UniProtKB/Swiss-Prot annotation:
PANTHER family: 4-HYDROXYBENZOATE POLYPRENYLTRANSFERASE, MITOCHONDRIAL, PRENYLTRANSFERASES. Changing residue 340 to A: In COQ10D1; uncertain significance. This is 4-hydroxybenzoate polyprenyltransferase, mitochondrial. GO terms for cellular component: extrinsic component of mitochondrial inner membrane; mitochondrial inner membrane; mitochondrion. Its cofactor is Mg(2+).
C-alpha cells in the first residue's frame, strides 16, 4: 500500500518537473499574453504542432488533470497547465534582481522565490481578466471555445470571485516588499486590467503587453535597493518591452486569419510582409538597451558574452522565421524562454566576475604598498 502511494507521489513529482523545470525536453508552452487574447493570453500551440510541443502540452496538462475535478477549471483558467507565460513574465524580474545583487554575490534567492510566486499569481489573474473580457470572442473561435468561461465550466461571477482570491494572494506577496516597491507594484494593476482591451482598438496590443509583462524589470531592483536607479532600470525595462514585441509579434502570426475574421488587431497584421525588418529593428533596440544596462551597472565580460549569444539567437530566430507557417512561429516563440535564461545567466556570471576583478585590484594595491 505504502509502496504504491510512494510510486504515485514520485510520478506526480516527475509530472511537475516535466511541466515547469527549464532544460528538460518537456518544455511547457502557452504564453498568456498577460491576458491572453484569442491571439494572446493563453497562447495555444498551432493546429498541428510538432510532436515535441504536443508532448510538452500533455505533460503540463497532467499536473492539472491530477487535481480534484472541481478544481481543474480554475487551474486552467489561470493557465497553470501552460507555464511558458509565467516564465516570460518572471524572467525580467530575475534580470533586475540579478543586477541589483552586490558585486561577487549570487542574486537574492528569497526575492527570486517571492517574485516567482507573484508571477504565477499575476499571470493567472491576467488570464482570468482576459477571459472575462473576451468570453464572447472565445466562443466564436475553435481554439478558444474550450476555455473554462467560454465553455460554461465557470460562470462570470465565479471567475470574478476567483480573480479576487488571486489578487488577494498577490497582494500578500507584494506586502512582503518595501513601501516603495508596494506602491510601484500596485501601479501595474491598471495595465493588467486594460491590456485585453487594446487588441480591440489598436494594432499595437503587443506594446501594451510589453509594458505590462516587463514591470518586474523595475520592481526587482527596487525590492533589493529600496528604489529604482533610472540609469539601469529604465533601459532594462525598455529592453524587455522590445523583447515582448519580438516574441509576441511572432506568435500573433499564428492567429492573424482568425483575428481578421473576428475583428481583432495585432502587430502581425500591422507589419504583414514587413515583419522581419520590424523585428530586426526591435532586436537592435533590445541589444542596445541591454548594452547600456551593462555599462551603467558596471557589468563584466560574461555579461557581454551573453549578449553576443542573445544577438545570435535573435538573428537565427528572425532569419529562419516563416511567418506563414504557424508551427514555425510557435517554435520560434517558445525558444524565447531560452533567450531570457541566457540573459539571466550572463547577469549572474558577470556579477560574480566583479569579485575576481576586485580581488585582483586589491592584490595589486597591496603589492604596491608593500613595495
Amino acid at each position: 500500500m505504502l509502496g504504491s502511494r510512494a510510486a504515485g507521489f514520485a510520478r506526480g513529482l516527475r509530472a511537475v518537473a516535466l511541466a515547469w523545470l527549464p532544460g528538460w525536453r518537456g518544455r511547457s508552452f502557452a504564453l498568456a499574453r498577460a491576458a491572453g487574447a484569442p491571439h494572446g493570453g493563453d497562447l495555444q500551440p498551432p493546429a498541428c504542432p510538432e510532436p515535441r510541443g504536443r508532448q510538452l502540452s500533455l505533460s503540463a496538462a497532467a499536473v492539472v488533470d491530477s487535481a480534484p475535478r472541481p478544481l481543474q477549471p480554475y487551474l486552467r483558467l489561470m493557465r497553470l497547465d501552460k507555464p511558458i507565460g509565467t516564465w516570460l513574465l518572471y524572467l525580467p524580474c530575475t534580470w533586475s534582481i540579478g543586477l541589483a545583487a552586490e558585486p561577487g554575490c549570487f542574486p537574492d534567492w528569497y526575492m527570486l522565490s517571492l517574485f516567482g510566486t507573484g508571477a504565477i499569481l499575476m499571470r493567472g489573474a491576467g488570464c482570468t481578466i482576459n477571459d472575462m473580457w473576451d468570453q464572447d470572442y472565445d466562443k466564436k473561435v475553435t481554439r478558444t471555445a474550450n476555455r473554462p468561461i467560454a465553455a460554461g465550466d465557470i460562470s462570470t461571477f465565479q471567475s470574478f470571485v476567483f480573480l479576487g482570491g488571486q489578487l488577494t494572494l498577490a497582494l500578500g506577496v507584494l506586502l512582503c516588499l518595501n513601501y516603495y516597491s508596494i506602491a510601484l507594484g500596485a501601479g501595474s494593476l491598471l495595465l493588467v486590467i486594460t491590456y485585453p482591451l487594446m487588441k480591440r482598438i489598436s494594432y499595437w496590443p503587443q506594446l501594451a503587453l510589453g509594458l505590462t509583462f516587463n514591470w518586474g524589470a523595475l520592481l526587482g531592483w527596487s525590492a533589493i535597493k529600496g528604489s529604482c536607479d533610472p540609469s539601469v532600470c529604465l533601459p532594462l525595462y525598455f529592453s524587455g518591452v522590445m523583447w515582448t514585441l519580438i516574441y509576441d509579434t511572432i506568435y500573433a502570426h499564428q492567429d492573424k486569419r482568425d483575428d481578421v475574421l473576428i475583428g481583432l488587431k495585432s502587430t502581425a497584421l500591422r507589419f504583414g510582409e514587413n515583419t522581419k525588418p520590424w523585428l530586426s529593428g526591435f532586436s537592435v533596440a533590445m541589444l542596445g538597451a541591454l548594452s547600456l544596462v551593462g555599462v551603467n551597472s558596471g557589468q563584466t565580460a560574461p555579461y557581454y558574452a551573453a549578449l553576443g549569444a542573445v544577438g545570435a539567437h535573435l538573428t537565427h530566430q528572425i532569419y529562419t522565421l516563416d511567418i506563414h507557417r504557424p508551427e514555425d512561429c510557435w517554435n520560434k516563440f517558445i525558444s524565447n524562454r531560452t533567450l531570457g535564461l541566457i540573459v539571466f545567466l550572463g547577469i549572474v556570471l558577470g556579477n560574480l566576475w566583479k569579485e575576481k576583478k576586485t580581488d585582483k585590484t586589491k592584490k595589486g594595491i597591496e603589492n604596491k604598498i608593500e613595495n
